[in-house]
Amino acid sequence: MAVPKRRKSRSNTRSRRSQWKAAKTELVGVTVAGHAHKVPRRLLKAARLGLIDFDKR
C-alpha cells in the first residue's frame, strides 16, 4: 500500500475530498396500473412487480 512521504495539511486534505461529487440517480418512466411514475433504474423491476407502494409518496 502506498504511504505518503510527508504529512498533508488539513486544508489540502479537505480540498481534495471536496472534489468528489455524488452522481444523481437517473429516473426512468414506468407505468404501473395506468399511472406514470418515475423511479431509479435499479428499482424498475420492483416497481413493475408492484413491490413499491407509490401512494405513500
Swiss-Prot record:
Keywords: Ribonucleoprotein, Ribosomal protein. InterPro entries: Ribosomal_bL32 (IPR002677), Ribosomal_zn-bd (IPR011332). GO terms for molecular function: structural constituent of ribosome. One of its GO terms (cellular component) is large ribosomal subunit. Residues 1-19 have a biased composition (Basic residues). Residues 1-22 are annotated as: Disordered. GO terms for biological process: translation. Belongs to the bacterial ribosomal protein bL32 family. This is Large ribosomal subunit protein bL32. It comes from Mycobacterium tuberculosis (strain ATCC 25177 / H37Ra). The gene is rpmF.
